[in-house]
Amino acid sequence: MNNNNYKWETVGNAKFYTDGTTCTDIEVMDNAKTVSFIYPKFKIDRETCQKVFSSVENLIIERNVLSIIIPNKMFPNVKKVESESSNFIDGKYLIERTGMRLRNAFGQNENAVIDFTQFNRIENYAFEGCKAKNAVGLTKTRFLNVHGDAAFDGSGFLDQPFIGGIKCLGPFIIDIDETVNEIVLPEKIRYCVPKRPQKCIRVSDIDTLSKIRKLPQKVIIEDDKMYSDDALLYKLCSHDIEEIESHISRYKTIDGIVYSADMKTLILCPRGKTGEVRIPDGVVRIRKHAFSHTKIKKVIFPDTLQMIGDEAFYGCAELEEIDFGHGITRIGENGNQSMFSGCAFKKITFPPQIKEIGMRAFSLCYELEEVIFNEGLEVIQKEAFQNCPNLLEINLPASIKKVGTDAFVYNGSYSHIPDMNINITTIPENLGLAITHPGNTYGVRCVNVHIDNRNGIFDFVLPCSVSVIVGARTNIIINQMADCKYAKKLSGLRYLETAYMNASNSMYKYAVAYKTYKKAKNKCAKEFLLDNQKHVAKAIILEMEEKDFADFVKFDFINLKYDEDIVKCLEERNWTAALAYMLEEGKGRPEDALVI
């Protein structure tokens, strides 16, 4: 706004500070009864303008007026608004036609009755300075809503006493006593001020909770009309709630956690719950989402537990420890999935009775470093440990029969993820698809496969990312190795030994070839490195560490000559030792000249 264009102009009984389009200030002559608004826009700030014109009783809005924003206290005694503008309506209040928005109720007196059927939306400070304490029509229109949290600030409606810790205006909670221990909510609420009850809230209609934007630590349920457990999940999902107490026959509550009346199903743990949770004996099922996003650190299952629902512990970012007990045999029964996705485990030990780990059961556990699978485990479903970048060592038990697609794959955006080692004595069905993934990769991660079974000892280095066709063929060959007769004449062994040739891009291929020879010392990889020294060196510089470059050039068959392109890459990585080595190339340096 350029104040140089503004000036005072007199219109009738008033003067307006305006640039001809927008008015930002008003002065009214003493004893003036009427003020006419003639400019397109009126925008007078309630904080900077404290003027009061108590003599004015009528406001006239001319045809070309588009918007009016003025302090409600400026004209405390207005009784009538006359509008020739299509943007406002005639009446006792200043109401915008679009949306039927109440801008100003004006002063009114204590005995005045505000008719809430005249508008559908209440703007901020619409009742500031309004002395009226009575209202009609609050429940007659389902369209009525409060648009601003300061709508009733400074109004006579707030002069009423607190009842049950709240002040209500029909279906609107306009104030909350934040000092009392308990708040009692009415059954029907359409709006609540953004204040938080200090300790506890008592609820007779669970649907009202959706209007309470700041919940206390404890919620008491007294809604006998509840017929769906989902209502608890969706209405009580606030991180502020630490304890739930049930006063209805449908539920029992222990330590703030909700169970079915027969204590066979754990239905909901409040998200604010912390510390250790010991689930009581007799509980058979944990319902879907029951612990999702809670703050618990440890959970102990009873021996009676049989089933864990979808995403039951999803996103428990502080859950570090779990005791499975001796009862549950399948984590992810009946298609349930993502039960523990996104938790904070560093180590998981599965007891011997666990036979199956379900789909995505422990995916996205970024802190997970160690998993102990006991004998008895038969099936690991697809994506069970997907995107666990710190899970680098997998030892599968001899009892394993099948591993699902992408069970141990990392396909996230981190580029420098260490290689994963997988050790097996029994080859489960689908192992190839469980550890490789179709598509490109971020970085050069590999899987080192060690098989020690009755057919012999085999070591392969597989690229994590391959084409769909290559992944399928790799899987078939690994599956065939489970057949004793076939394994002894397996022509596909060479295919696995040269798996680097099937990496998803050329740079990846050279890096995997280096890793293959370093790990398995096979002849094919040696010949490949010998024929592609420069490409391999460049791949190592771009994707790996300086020590890898040193190890590569120390291979007794490698004779990497000075190359400007390689020198440039080394300079960009600031690998000073490797750069010095290349610059000294050809000067008769000893074989072990490069030390990192």
Predicted feature residues:
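Structural signature of tandem-repeat unit edges
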Residues: 1-123, 128-146, 153-170, 176-285, ...
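Gram-positive cell-envelope targeting signals
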Residues: 1-3, 593-596
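Alpha-helical elements of the RecA-like P-loop NTPase motor core of helicases
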Residues: 210, 362, 385, 580
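Extended alpha-helical scaffolding segments
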Residues: 531-593
